[in-house]
Amino acid sequence: MAKAGTVAASRLRLTRRAMLRAIGGIAITGIARPAVALQRDISFTLPWIPEGPNLITFVAKANGYWSKAGLNVDIAKGSGSVGAAQAIGNGQFQFGLSAATAGLQQAALGLPIVQISCCSYDAFMGMITMGDTGVIEPKDLEGKKFATTTKSGEFPFIPAFAQKAGLDLSKVEILQVDPNVRQRLLIEKQVSAISGFAPSIVPGYIVNGFSPRIIRFSKFGLPLYGNALFTQQALLEREAELCGAIAYGLNEAMKFVLLQPEESLAIFFKANPEMELAKGAHELNKLALDFFRYSSIHEGAKKHGIGYAPPDDYNVMTDLVMKYVAPDGKRPDFDGTVSNKFAGAVHLTDTDWSNVKLSLSNVTKLLT
């Protein structure tokens, strides 16, 4: 039989543990809750359907990078980056991914949105052609047909690309078509090139036996970044610790995806079993993921840590958005629209970065 003093000490220790757990709950949620109810529900939107460029969210959730901070993140499908940015900015979702340019556009139009982690340094906007079209450089498109979609995110930047690349668009027959028609026209050789986001188009061509080539806008001095993590300015000001937990968890997931792509794919398919049913599903999603991994290699991330947003590139990107996308908007200030507060905690070694780059020959061979 235990002594009374022993029982009292045991009860005291339990009480202290419970108290510490409660204090942890206050740190994350601002509200003291019982230990069994520490998980806080968080709403999160993707910019599109589950795919390679947003696979990191499923890794962050499955690997517990968010739940260890007491966060239960519900991931919703999106219908486009602009729609995702709008939904985040107006508070429909607390967090989400969207193309960096879409976030800047909405900020210019007055939406109170702020970026808290840079995930991709290249959206792979560009011209997509086939190996037998004779189009190797942009100027080769002169005298040929080119298909594009007006509602696609790269469309507004085609004039800037043409100017930088020395392409005279007046000498190109431009067809404005539906996205599905656009991709078919290239296969049927009715056009010599199309515009679009390579990670969403090229893997499907590869799986079906075609030989696409990509001419990236970024190759010609247009830093048009891919997915970034966004929230509302008010939430960042009010709950910086919560925003940091979401950003840190996503940055940890980026590191995992960069170093362990096959394990990341397995997590993705487990979370989205319907994505494994398509023809060539593994090859298709692996290539889409590798586009993302390729786009995550940047001197800013190497020097300052995963999630870092380089101010100079963002200023150029903002100039492009103001000129071609939101000319009637108010130019957003970098410090008020982009935060590097949560970058710097997650790093790869120089050897890791080199090995990641060596593993991406499947992407490199597609670039002109």
Where are the regions that the model predicts?
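N-terminal secretory signal peptides
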Residues: 1-14, 18, 22-29
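N-terminal signal peptide c-region/cleavage motif recognized by signal peptidases
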Residues: 32-34
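Short, glycine-/small- and polar/acidic-enriched structural segments
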Residues: 37-199, 215-216, 222-223, 368
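Short linear loop/turn motifs
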Residues: 74, 82, 176, 219-220, ...
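Pocket-lining segment of extracytoplasmic ligand-binding domains
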Residues: 101, 181-183, 190-280
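Secondary-structure end/capping motifs
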Residues: 239-327
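Conserved C-terminal helix/tail region of periplasmic/extracytoplasmic solute-binding proteins
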Residues: 314-368
